[in-house]
């Protein structure tokens, strides 16, 4: 069952000046989750994001990729109904990007609706079911992903997919 209706993960991970454990479990504490359940979920999630060895160090000491995985896990640990992501893998290495994409796919399969902004066409192809194409803050098209990449209805979307500059 969802503890939080909506969660948001920023492009630049936001860390509390606390340990990895405290950052990860902060939303559970706010939801007044029992301590035993907090410990169980923390153990599960630090394993999933490969941070078990550093669970008690300050989160601010992590690499950018580790911080982003922690920020995502902190959002997902609550089993949100809706997850909003702003360029969650921008400037991350390929390995970390794939790890994050796997977490997102698993969460979507388990019922979380994910809305993600991205400029990464490959990532959109791998993850999206539906594409909302925005240009200068205005919605230009909404299509199922398979159709969007085959037959985009927006001229700007067509240019973007082709790698052209969209003005």
Model-derived features with residue positions:
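Helix N-cap at the start of a conserved alpha-helix in ABC-type nucleotide-binding domains
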Residues: 94-96
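Conserved ABC ATPase "signature" region
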Residues: 36-54
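H-loop/switch region of ABC-family ATPase nucleotide-binding domains
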Residues: 118-119
